């Protein structure tokens, strides 16, 4: 704003002149009343046009009278002219005062409007700052959620890798299980062959045991026959002893008779009889010896046959016992191997069941985590939608603030233009009427200009801040939408991977149930 100086040539006596007042524009009236104006005009006119004193006191009274009359007429004319001019000036000053007052009122109203707009801009700035702070907090929250999502994504990648490893292990387990099933079938076939061999061996053992029992019976019979023959030999010996005794008795009797006969017969006959007796005795003895030797030979041959048969039976029993021990040992080994195989198969089955259960638990855990992740994604989508709405509202508010700033700028420009027009009017009034000047202090002018520049700087700074905040919010919104789209894509990929892993786990569970059913079918057959 320009500085307007309207120093009045005359001031009322009660108001001394002020060289440079500090304050607003002086819009007071230069005169309190018409009487004051006339008195001031009279004083000024008398002071300006005071006639010189007469040097001589010898002038006549007529000249004084005419001079006084002419002076009074002149003064009266001058007073009337001055009065007219003062009236004109007074009217102009009143009109200028009214115009200045109206301009001041309009300027005050515009200043009040500018203050209100400045307050609204400040409030909008505070709202924008709070919105920016909220957006920054939300952005930090989204970044933390993004980090959590990244960590969750890494966890899901690890879980997917573990699922792939579990799938690979399950395939290996399936292959090992197929190999173990084939080995079990081969072992079952071998067990069936061994069982058939054991049945054949058991039949052989039964036959051998039957043969051994028969051999034992035959040996017992032979032993009984040998004992019987021994008894018969003893009886024969006893009978032979008895016969010998009877023979001895008869021989003694015969000898006695022979003695008697010898005494009664001649010596030749006696001699012949003795020879005959010797021959007969020798013959009997030889016959008995021959008979006994024959019986002994028969008994010895029978005993030899019995011993030979018993030794052959013993060797056969020994070989059969050795063969039976080998068969029993082989049977025990087969049973031990079958038991170990069953234990190994049961352990493998338990291990496979445990691994399948672990895989199923992991799959269930993965399914639950996938559900939680879906819920988190839905929540993120809802939050993103809410954030989008909040950002849209913030953008609308910022647009409103921008429009308000633009309106404030236009209003400020209009006020500046009005102030310039007012200044030009006052300057024109000052140039037109140099005696009518309105004073404004230098400090007031500097303060007004400083306030004006400060308001311009604040408006420009607020406009730039609002534009920067708007750009930052738009960039953060675009970045958040891009990150959300990336997260949604990653979640969709992870969901597809989890669905594939779950399908594979279901296939593995079905294979496990089939294998379990087959094992349950095989167990009664093994039993």
Curated annotation (Swiss-Prot):
Residues 1-28, 46-70 are annotated as: Disordered. Keywords: Coiled coil. Residues 55-68 have a biased composition (Low complexity). The keyword Coiled coil applies. InterPro entries: Web (IPR008545). Residues 95-159, 202-389, 436-513 form a coiled coil. The keyword ATP-binding does not apply. Pfam families: WEMBL (PF05701). Belongs to the WEB family. This is Putative WEB family protein At4g17210.
């Amino acid at each position: 704003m320009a500085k307007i100086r309207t120093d009045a040539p005359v001031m009322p006596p009660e108001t001394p002149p002020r060289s440079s007042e500090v304050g607003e524009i002086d819009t007071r009236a230069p005169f309190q009343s018409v009487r004051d104006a006339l008195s001031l005009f009279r004083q000024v006119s008398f002071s300006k046009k005071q006639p010189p004193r007469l040097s001589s006191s010898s002038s006549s009274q007529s000249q004084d009278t005419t001079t006084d009359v002419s002076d009074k007429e002149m003064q009266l004319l001058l007073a009337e002219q001055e009065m007219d001019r003062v009236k004109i000036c007074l009217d102009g000053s009143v009109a200028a005062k009214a115009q200045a007052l109206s301009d001041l009122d309009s300027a005050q109203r515009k200043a009040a409007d500018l203050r209100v707009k400045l307050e609204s801009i400040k409030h909008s700035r505070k709202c924008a700052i709070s919105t920016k702070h909220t957006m920054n907090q939300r952005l930090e929250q989204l970044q933390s959620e993004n980090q959590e999502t990244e960590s969750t994504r890494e966890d899901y990648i690890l879980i997917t890798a573990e699922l792939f490893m579990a799938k690979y292990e399950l395939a290996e387990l399936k292959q090992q299980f197929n190999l173990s099933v084939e080995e079990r079938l081969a072992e079952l076939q071998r067990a069936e062959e061994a069982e058939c061999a054991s049945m054949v061996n058991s039949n052989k053992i039964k036959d051998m045991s039957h043969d051994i029992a028969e051999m034992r019976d035959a040996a017992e019979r032979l032993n009984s026959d040998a004992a019987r023959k021994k008894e018969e030999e003893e009886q024969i010996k006893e009978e032979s002893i008895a016969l010998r005794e009877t023979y001895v008795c008869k021989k003694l009797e015969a000898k006695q008779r022979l003695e008697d006969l010898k005494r009664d017969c001649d010596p030749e006959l006696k001699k012949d009889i003795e020879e005959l007796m010797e021959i007969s005795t020798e013959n009997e003895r030889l016959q008995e010896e021959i008979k006994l030797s024959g019986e002994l030979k028969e008994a010895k041959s029978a005993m030899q046959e019995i011993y030979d048969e018993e030794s052959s039976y013993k060797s056969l029993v020994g070989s059969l016992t050795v063969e039976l021990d080998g068969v029993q040992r082989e049977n025990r080994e087969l049973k031990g191997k079958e038991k170990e195989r069953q234990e190994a198969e049961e352990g493998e089955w338990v291990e496979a069941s445990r691994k399948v259960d672990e895989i199923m638990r992991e799959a269930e855990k993965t399914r639950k985590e996938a559900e939680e992740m879906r819920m988190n994604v839905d929540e993120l989508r809802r939050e993103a939608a809410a954030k989008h709405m909040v950002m849209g509202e913030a953008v609308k508010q910022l647009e409103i603030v921008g429009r308000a700033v633009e309106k404030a700028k236009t209003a400020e420009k209009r006020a500046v233009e009005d102030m310039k027009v007012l200044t030009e009017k006052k300057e024109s009034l000052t140039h037109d009427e140099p005696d009518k000047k309105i004073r404004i202090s230098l400090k007031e002018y500097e303060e007004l200009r400083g306030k004006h520049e400060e308001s311009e700087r604040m408006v420009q700074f607020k406009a730039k801040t609002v534009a920067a905040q708007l750009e930052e919010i738009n960039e953060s919104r675009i970045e958040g939408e891009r990150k959300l789209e990336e997260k949604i894509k990653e979640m969709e990929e992870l969901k597809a991977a989890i669905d594939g892993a779950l399908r594979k786990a279901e296939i593995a569970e079905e294979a496990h149930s089939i294998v379990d059913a087959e094992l349950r079918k095989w167990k009664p057959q093994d039993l």
